[in-house]
Amino acid sequence: MKPAYFISDLHLSEKHPELTALLLRFLRSSAAGQARAVYILGDLFDFWVGDDEVSELNTSVAREIRKLSDKGVAVFFVRGNRDFLIGQDFCRQAGMTLLPDYSVLDLFGCKTLICHGDTLCTDDRAYQRFRKIVHRKRLQKLFLMLPLKWRTRLATKIRRVSKMEKQVKPADIMDVNAAFTARQVRAFGAERLIHGHTHREHIHHENGFTRIVLGDWHNDYASILRVDGDGAVFVPLEKY
């Protein structure tokens, strides 16, 4: 049976064209073209200020995802903490299906819960408070009404502050809370969880389920999770 592929945390930006080149290479590969589905679990872009922003980066990525979708490969997207403002307009342009924060898939007979992963990091209370605020629909609507230049400037400032705060936060609070994560998996009746966000690529076997953490992409290393009837395995992008 055709495999499914999972990626997250590419953090594409015009400052790092090499990462965009890696993604385009994968999307154009024969492996991607023969997949049953490709799942992008958030933070595809380093930041997103609205679907109305037109750039060479956004356009080229949407174009290549659309080409893959037009081949009959289903492409799904879950918003991340950096690109949570991606909306239906961009997803339609790219031929992607926008999924909610949590979704349960039947992958080759294994009930699998997928999400970006930031909602699982409940020990980082400051971030969870911030997330609750910026996910308010009314606030998002007001933000998207601002001129594009203002939105970009504000997003840049928020990113700068976030980066500074991250440098002084204890590493453990930026990982998932094990007890909360286990409860979520049980609540959805899943046997396996796939998420990104923490950048700690690993396959864990814990609390009666499998937890797979997707890694982030760098110019010297990027991996893709391949899931098929034999299980799940990380494959270096260089093999595609």
Swiss-Prot record:
Its EC number is 3.6.1.54. Mn(2+) 2 binds at residues 43, 81, 116, 197. Transmembrane segments: none annotated. It comes from the Bacteria. Keywords: Cell inner membrane, Cell membrane, Hydrolase, Lipid A biosynthesis, Lipid biosynthesis, Lipid metabolism, Manganese, Membrane, Metal-binding. Mn(2+) 1 binds at residues 9, 11, 43, 199. GO terms for cellular component: cytoplasm; extrinsic component of plasma membrane. InterPro entries: Calcineurin-like_PHP_ApaH, LpxH-like, Metallo-depent_PP-like, UDP-diacylglucosamine_Hdrlase. It is a peripheral membrane protein. Its cofactor is Mn(2+). One of its GO terms (molecular function) is UDP-2,3-diacylglucosamine hydrolase activity. GO terms for biological process: lipid A biosynthetic process. Substrate binds at residues 81-82, 124, 162, 166, 169, 197. It is found in: Cell inner membrane. Binds 2 Mn(2+) ions per subunit in a binuclear metal center. Hydrolyzes the pyrophosphate bond of UDP-2,3-diacylglucosamine to yield 2,3-diacylglucosamine 1-phosphate (lipid X) and UMP by catalyzing the attack of water at the alpha-P atom. Involved in the biosynthesis of lipid A, a phosphorylated glycolipid that anchors the lipopolysaccharide to the outer membrane of the cell. Belongs to the LpxH family. PANTHER family: UDP-2,3-DIACYLGLUCOSAMINE HYDROLASE, UDP-2,3-DIACYLGLUCOSAMINE HYDROLASE-RELATED. This is UDP-2,3-diacylglucosamine hydrolase. The lineage of its organism: Bacteria, Pseudomonadati, Pseudomonadota, Betaproteobacteria, Neisseriales.
